[in-house]
Every structure is written in C-alpha cells, then in structure tokens.
Amino acid sequence: MGKWVSVAEKRQFLKWFLTQQLKRKDAKRILEYLLQHYHLLEQVMFTEEIRGRERTLVISTLQSDEPGFAFYLYRRKIEDPIRALGELQANPADPIYLILHFHGKAQNHQYLQMLDSESREYIKRFKQFQAYKEETDSLIEAVLIENEKKMLLQQIDEALDLKDERRFKDLVKKLQELDRRSS
C-alpha cells in the first residue's frame, strides 16, 4: 500500500506538473480530469514501478526519455488516453498508480515525498548505483591511461635502443598528448 498523501499536496504537485510540456497533449486531459474530481484524486498514489495487477498511469514530459503515455490496466497496456480516461471514469473507486517522468525528478523533493516507500528506496538505490558507476568509470579511465603510458614508455625505450629518432619523437608527442588528456 502506498504512503498517505493529502489531496491538496497531490493537487498542488499535479498543477505544477501540468505547467511542463507533455509529450502527449491528450494525456493532459486525464490529469485535468483527476484534478477536477476529488474522489479520484484520493485514489491516486505516486510510484515508480508498474503495478501488474493494478491500474497504472504513466505520463512523461518532453525532457524525458520515456514514452509519452501508457496506461496499464491489469497487465494490459493501453496507449490511447481517451480509453484510459473512460476506464478511470467507469471505476472511480479503484486505486490509480501514477508514474510521472520529467527532468530532475530524482532531485524534486516534493515529488520524492509523495512516492510510496518502495519507490523512494528504488530512487535511493538508483542514485547510489549512479555514484558507483561514475566512480568506476573514472577508475577504469585512469587505469587505461596508466597502461597506455606504460606501453608508450616501453616503446620509447625501444626507439632509443634502436636509435630511431623519428619514432622516438612520434612516441614522445603521443605521450605528451596523453598527459594533456589525463590532466
């Protein structure tokens, strides 16, 4: 079960969300309909995962990489907002799980406060994995550069042993470029 969030908080956030440019303009009608009907807004729970056995509404802004609209109705995916709106009108007492995709949502405290606890934990883990990924990428990059430097230094030694001045100068130039890139 989701975290309790007041209808006023949901309304305030959804009004802000509607100021964003949505990928599917007809999805805006659904959110406006929810805002106009208190009893439906009571049923809305913000989440980050599609609930296979529940009604889940997914809406994205233009700044998101996610699809613009999808409505999951008991394991069926519906991409027509008009049909989704009809389903919401026909079954007003059923819970509505809402997934919103927009730029900066991982840092939007108002949004994060409304997410159910499982979703908050999911975002927390995602942020941690992003930090691990960045750390790992920079470590791998440093190791690759260090290996390339060692290889160039060995080749420079070989060029000196063979008294190959042209190759020596080329390799020194490559080493200097590598040093500039890694600084």
UniProtKB/Swiss-Prot annotation:
Pfam assignment, any one: IDEAL
Superkingdom classification of source: Bacteria
Endpoints of the signal sequence: none
Residue ranges the record marks as coiled coil: none
Record InterPro entries: IDEAL_dom, UPF0302, UPF0302_N, UPF0302_N_sf, Virus_scaffolding_prot_C
HAMAP family given in the database record: UPF0302 (MF_00760)
Family of this protein: Belongs to the UPF0302 family.
Protein name from the UniProt record: UPF0302 protein BH3876
Organism whose genome encodes this protein: Halalkalibacterium halodurans (strain ATCC BAA-125 / DSM 18197 / FERM 7344 / JCM 9153 / C-125) (Bacillus halodurans)
